[in-house]
């Protein structure tokens, strides 16, 4: 479980921000979203493959040289 200690004279909003950052870093929010509803194994594979293809296209797009302007 993620805990934070309140520092002396620390505003509540700052403590909440630190807590949110901590649980985001732990991956708790992502896991909660994944477990919210059951996803078939085939759907998981399909989603992961689509994400991999998207990453590949993004990497290739950034490596391409710009076209020459005449």
From Swiss-Prot:
Gene Ontology BP terms: translation
InterPro entries attached to this UniProt entry: Ribosomal_bS21, Ribosomal_bS21_sf
Protein family: Belongs to the bacterial ribosomal protein bS21 family.
Entry-linked PANTHER family: MITOCHONDRIAL 28S RIBOSOMAL PROTEIN S21, SMALL RIBOSOMAL SUBUNIT PROTEIN BS21
Family matches, as NCBIfam families: S21p
One family name in Pfam for this protein: Ribosomal_S21
Disulfide bond sites: none
Keyword Ribonucleoprotein: yes
This protein's name: Small ribosomal subunit protein bS21A
GO molecular function terms listed in the Swiss-Prot or TrEMBL record: structural constituent of ribosome
Keywords, alphabetical: Ribonucleoprotein, Ribosomal protein
UniProt entry tagged with the keyword Ribonucleoprotein: yes
Gene Ontology cellular-component terms listed: ribonucleoprotein complex; ribosome
